[in-house]
Design a protein with these regions (language model features):
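N-terminal subdomain of nucleotide-sugar transferases
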Residues: 1-54
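Conserved catalytic-core segment of nucleotide-activated headgroup transferases in glycan assembly
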Residues: 27, 170, 174-177, 181, ...
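Short acidic alpha-helix that forms the nucleotide-activated donor recognition element
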Residues: 75-81, 167-170, 283-292, 314
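Short N-terminal targeting/anchoring amphipathic segment
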Residues: 78-96, 111
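Acidic donor-binding loop of glycosyltransferase active sites
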Residues: 83, 173, 290-304, 315-317
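Short acidic/histidine- and often glycine-rich active-site loop of Leloir-type glycosyltransferases
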Residues: 121, 323-337
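Membrane-proximal helix-turn-helix segments that form the acceptor-binding/catalytic region
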Residues: 135-175
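Short hydrophobic beta-strand element within catalytic cores of glycosyltransferases
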Residues: 308-311, 318-322
């Protein structure tokens, strides 16, 4: 590469970015913009079909190139492109394409964007399933939320998913981590070298200048992509347990639930008589968040950090969540406000 040539970056996405559908999509766009700010030349590829709310990357000057799984055409594509950096979006993309990149572009820097530790999220999901199988009627999940790092490691380390994800991190030169809690878990429990991990949280370009006053707001709000398992579990928990308790205290309360790709099973929960409103996709998440009095995020499992809670902060909207929801969202051991 000549001294004047622009750095070429290939991003291999698990899906095409949809910043208005998920926090992960928004974070990817933030990363892409940071690359563009460096004057780098970007190519975005994905084996996924384009979603309904896909961002137009070409409008930003990013080349879009669909690719296929298990197809030698990728070998020719990456060899001709000759990227200086390859960013894999989630470890599954590294598994599929990393060895091909190593073979045809051995000098390329390989970077993994984890979004969140999937092995942590899945281990927590399995623990929740185990608790629910016991048939308890209690809604106190404090023991589930109060897992020490050593306990988290015990649950994670025995899974094939953890072995695959950790292996992908080792194969890459650097991994972008959105959560400091997950960095500590990898370093202290899995004994990964800290030099392999780089903290890359959600990035904000501009802060709002003011908030709508409480008197101009109405209703409670919950928001999240219905395809994301932690969000769907939160919807069911709200419907069956949390919301009835709120309505006992506030009979006139109304809850508006927004999310991309509303499935029939979610639409079937719509019940205005109970104040439970399935509102489908919000074109402008900050607009609906700014109009709400409270943001509910009763997440019983998950990982990473939560874009919906950051949006609530930006809008001056109080949020109510669980320790899983607030994880890595506050510093210096401060309690969630």
């Amino acid at each position: 590469m000549s001294p004047t040539a622009a750095t070429k970056v290939l991003i291999i996405g698990y899906v095409w970015p949809e910043p208005r559908s998920s926090a992960a999509g928004g974070h990817m766009m933030q990363i892409l913009q940071s690359f563009l700010d460096q004057g780098w030349e970007l190519t975005f590829s994905s084996p996924a079909n384009e979603g309904e709310h896909k961002e137009d990357l070409t409008a930003l000057g990013i080349r879009e190139c669909p690719i296929e799984l298990n197809n030698a055409s990728f070998d020719r594509f990456v060899a001709e492109l000759a990227p200086d950096i390859v960013l894999f979006d989630q470890f599954m993309m590294e598994e599929q394409f990393g060895w091909r990149v190593e073979q045809h572009c051995p000098n390329a820097l390989r970077v993994l964007e984890t979004s969140d530790l999937q092995c942590l999220r899945h281990a927590r999901h399995q623990r929740l399933k185990d608790v629910l199988k016991e048939g308890t009627e209690e809604d106190d999940f404090s023991p589930l939320f109060a897992q020490a790092p050593e306990q988290e490691f015990q649950h994670m380390s025995v899974t094939d998913l953890a072995k695959r994800e950790i292996a992908a991190i080792y194969r890459c030169d650097l991994s972008l981590m959105i959560s400091e809690v997950e960095i500590e878990l990898l370093v202290q429990q899995f004994h990964l070298p800290p030099a392999l991990l780089h903290w890359c949280p959600l990035m904000l370009e501009q802060l709002p200048q003011g908030f709508a006053p409480f008197e101009q707001r109405a209703h409670l709000l919950s928001i999240g992509n219905f395809r994301h398992a932690p969000n769907w579990d939160a919807v069911l928990w709200m419907k069956n347990r949390v919301w009835p308790l709120i309505r006992q205290q506030l009979p006139g309360a109304q809850l508006h639930l927004y999310g991309a790709y509303t499935p029939p099973k979610a639409a079937a929960l719509h019940n205005p008589a109970q104040g439970f409103h399935i509102m489908n996709w919000a074109e402008d998440a900050l607009q609906v968040m700014s109009a709400a009095r409270i943001c509910l995020a009763p997440l019983r499992f998950g990982a990473g950090i939560k874009g919906k809670l950051l949006d609530a902060m930006l809008c001056g909207t109080p949020s109510v969540t669980t320790p899983v929801g607030s994880e890595s969202m506050s510093q210096d051991g401060l309690p969630w406000p």
